[in-house]
Amino acid sequence: MTESAASPGTFACARFIKEIGRGPNGARALSPEDTHALYSAMLDGRVSDIELGAVMLAYRLKGETAAELAAMLEAAQASFALLRVPAGESRPVSIPSYNGARKQPNLVPLLALLLAREGVPTLVHGVSEDAGRVTSAEIFARLGIAPAKSHPEIEAQLASRALAFAPIEVLAPKLARLLALRRIMGVRNSTHTLVKILQPFSSPGLRLVNYTHPEYRESLAELFAGHPAAAVGGALLARGTEGEAVADTRRQVQIDWLHDGVAETLVAAERSSSEAQPAALPESRDADTTAAWTQAVLDGRQPVPPTLARQVETIVRVARQD
């Protein structure tokens, strides 16, 4: 964090806090220009501790408008070097993984490995650990897939095996610093939303974006429909599984393809049935058990859950379109 006392080069935030800090009913949105300047300063460490905390809590209460989110996203993506992936049959796919598993097994690594097996360059980026949850990083480690340690290593792994896991501190260290403030403040901040919608590739790839609450779906749809720069490369939007962008094995959720200002439903939601046979899943959600089961699926000793197979087919189809 930055020093609390003002110092040369510090970005003054009082006039912004005055607008966004009036509570959920009285707060006003900042202009895109002011939002970009403010979030850029936060990324660069030019905001004092007390003002940084005030801004984060103000947005926590107010929420970001689509225009503010687009401006923050532009600043976020300018804060790290975008990844270069050789042109091929498929566009690259990025899967954010910042929540991990708490009740359901974490199937993000299986999703990524199934996509890589189809020749789709797949980047999973996220946190390495999260108390009380099983992260994708932990499952990848049990499968012998080590995290990339640099941008060149991410690019090399995507080129050689069509799969890479990048800790956020490797992919985008400035974002990682703001993300880590949750441990101090006890609550998430705008950066937790931004890392889940990053476009990490220099030649835009397809993003998997998930939501938990219906109102968040509407705000994401507004972001991608109304802000072309934020939508470049397109996104597949669906309700997540415990905050992860992987299919829910218990029911088929709707999958929308957001591209070129439109939202196209590719997979319709289906009602869950008490008579339906539940998908075969790991007996436990711990990393060792999940990794062993994942390997069994890859080896053909266990079936791919139907909703996950449909998700893979949908992603591959979109990634291979011009």
Question: Would you name each region that the model predicts?
Answer:
Residues 87-93, 117-121, 135, 159-163, ...:
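Short coil/turn connectors at secondary-structure junctions
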Residues 1-104, 116-122, 275-284, 291-303, ...:
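Acidic, glycine/proline-rich low-complexity segments that act as flexible tails and inter-domain linkers
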Residues 88-156:
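A generic, well-ordered mixed alpha/beta core segment in the N-terminal half of proteins
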Residues 55, 140, 195, 312:
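Residue-level signal for inorganic ion chemistry
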